[in-house]
């Protein structure tokens, strides 16, 4: 294969659902790619993982799922891959073609436009899959489904997936001022009662940066996925958690984040990164779920709960999330401060 080739899309966009069209169109503009490229935690982690495993990439066929501007494809080609196939549905792949040619990788990288399920790969099997598929709360936009499709249809037995391990974590947080501002605003809007908006506001998780000192409980690992073995059905999950208050404080909700781990040569520490409040900033930030009530916690009080996550029935790239919890408080007035409640949320 001697020429980078982007032909007409293998997928006819007009035949996609409106939500699918909106999703792919959102990646047409350079701005979203600029934000991802400038996320050095994200981009350098991929580069460093490829460099650490350059012996494994040498002379291998690599599939880049959702290649965007082609940065991961070029990392792989630069560090020894025999050939890289980049697949993307959005029009940004036209720019990727220009970038690949400009940087001298036309003979090593083939770009295909379309959904992975629709394109025809120039090789029957690949040795390595690379993909930056993660969304907010890890699973939002459900691109992991496509990576698993690539694994099941194209990856050789014993092939590698970069990254291959991921986990979702959560902790309690104090965020009274911001929560009050968001909710109290609707009590008096230019002299009118707009309080019916309050449940709608609570129903929507917030993606934002949480300061480390706002986290006021222990953390817990909600779930872990191994991309070598996980099934699409596993991505709809139910998981229990337990958190313990680390100080006397209000607990207004939970903050969630995810951790990522790449394969590593035997005896080497793997490249990994976290998107939590304790870690350097990433464009994924954190995802906040406000509780229906505020918990008045003393040191050692506990929250035990269950989080249920599933694709939304109208748009499977959105997520339905339900959090039920039991807050048990100690002390003289512990009974009056204890709570049992649940909240339902939609990430869209």
From Swiss-Prot:
Question: Is Nucleus given among the entry's keywords?
Answer: yes
Q: Which GO terms describe its biological process?
A: chromatin remodeling; folic acid biosynthetic process; methylation; mRNA export from nucleus; negative regulation of termination of DNA-templated transcription; positive regulation of transcription elongation by RNA polymerase II; regulation of DNA-templated transcription
What GO molecular function terms would the record report?
histone methyltransferase activity; identical protein binding; protein-arginine N-methyltransferase activity; protein-arginine omega-N asymmetric methyltransferase activity; protein-arginine omega-N monomethyltransferase activity
User: Which InterPro entries has this protein been placed in?
Assistant: Arg_MeTrfase (IPR025799), PRMT_dom (IPR055135), SAM-dependent_MTases_sf (IPR029063)
EC numbers for this chain = 2.1.1.319
**Group of enzyme by EC:** transferase
Q: Which PROSITE patterns does this one have?
A: SAM_MT_PRMT
Question: What keywords would UniProt list here?
Answer: Methyltransferase, Nucleus, S-adenosyl-L-methionine, Transferase
Tell me what reaction this enzyme catalyses. L-arginyl-[protein] + S-adenosyl-L-methionine = N(omega)-methyl-L-arginyl-[protein] + S-adenosyl-L-homocysteine + H(+); L-arginyl-[protein] + 2 S-adenosyl-L-methionine = N(omega),N(omega)-dimethyl-L-arginyl-[protein] + 2 S-adenosyl-L-homocysteine + 2 H(+)
Q: What does this protein do?
A: S-adenosyl-L-methionine-dependent protein-arginine N-methyltransferase that catalyzes both the mono- and asymmetric (type I) dimethylation of the guanidino nitrogens of arginine residues in a variety of RNA-binding proteins such as heterogeneous nuclear ribonucleoproteins (hnRNPs) and small nuclear ribonucleoproteins (snRNPs). Methylates NAB2, NPL3, HRP1 and YRA1, shuttling hnRNPs involved in mRNA processing and export, facilitating their export out of the nucleus.
Family, as annotated: Belongs to the class I-like SAM-binding methyltransferase superfamily. Protein arginine N-methyltransferase family.
* Subunit record text: Homodimer. The dimers can then associate to form a ring-shaped homohexamer. Interacts with NPL3, BRE5, MTR4, SNF2, SUM1, and SSD1.
- The protein here is known as Protein arginine N-methyltransferase 1
Organism expressing this protein natively: Saccharomyces cerevisiae (strain ATCC 204508 / S288c) (Baker's yeast)
